[in-house]
C-alpha cells in the first residue's frame, strides 16, 4: 500500500537521526575545546607552582614585571640604566623591612596573603567607578603580580593573582616571601630591589639604610616612577613622617 500524502514519508527518520548526529558532533567539539583550555590552564598553574617551589632554594633572576618594564624603557627611554642586585635577607636593614610593612601591609606577618576587608572595599570602589582602579593588595599579592603577571587590570588577572598568592603562602615561608619581594619590587625608573634603591638614592648598601631613608623609600612603592621624578614632593616628606612613626609597631615575619 502506498504512503498517504500526509504521512512523514521515508525521509523523516533519517532527518531526525542526522540532527542528533549534528548535535553530538557539536557537543564533542565543545568538549574537546573545553578540554584543551582546561589542560592549558592546569599546565599554567603547574608551571607557577614548580617555579615557586624552586624559589624556596634558588633566588629568582628577575620578575615578569622587571622584564616587561625593562623592555618598555629600552624603547621609550633607551638611556635609562637598569639597576638590580640581589642581596640576602639579613643584608637588608631592619628599618627598611619595618618601613615597607608599615606602608604596604601592616598585618603581613600574620595574614594568609589576603585581606578580605581590603578586597571587598576595592570591589565596591571598582564597581562604583565601573572599572578596576584598586586591588586591595597585600605584599604577597603584589609579589604574585610582579613575578608572573602583566600590568593589565582585569578580573581574570585578579583571579590568577589570588591563586598565585595562595601558592606563595603555601610553598614559601613569610620571611622568604618578604626577601623575594624586597629584592624585586620597583623603587624608581629602572630601579628594582632594596640594594639597587639604597645605592641609587643614597650611595650606600641596603644594610646601612637609616630609619628616615627607609621611610622615604617605602612611601615611593605605590608610585615609584612618579616619586623618582618628584623627590622634593611635600606629600612624599609628609607621608614618610607618618611611616616613620608607624615603623616601631611593624611586626616582622618570624625566622623559620
From Swiss-Prot:
Chief site of localization: membrane
One annotated GO biological process: regulation of cell shape
Keyword Membrane: yes
Spans through the membrane: 26-48
Catalytically driven reaction(s): [GlcNAc-(1->4)-Mur2Ac(oyl-L-Ala-gamma-D-Glu-L-Lys-D-Ala-D-Ala)](n)-di-trans,octa-cis-undecaprenyl diphosphate + beta-D-GlcNAc-(1->4)-Mur2Ac(oyl-L-Ala-gamma-D-Glu-L-Lys-D-Ala-D-Ala)-di-trans,octa-cis-undecaprenyl diphosphate = [GlcNAc-(1->4)-Mur2Ac(oyl-L-Ala-gamma-D-Glu-L-Lys-D-Ala-D-Ala)](n+1)-di-trans,octa-cis-undecaprenyl diphosphate + di-trans,octa-cis-undecaprenyl diphosphate + H(+)
E.C. number: 2.4.99.28
Function: Peptidoglycan polymerase that catalyzes glycan chain elongation from lipid-linked precursors.
Family: Belongs to the glycosyltransferase 51 family.
UniProt protein name: Biosynthetic peptidoglycan transglycosylase
Species for this entry: Burkholderia mallei (strain ATCC 23344)
Lineage: Bacteria, Pseudomonadati, Pseudomonadota, Betaproteobacteria, Burkholderiales
Record gene name: mtgA
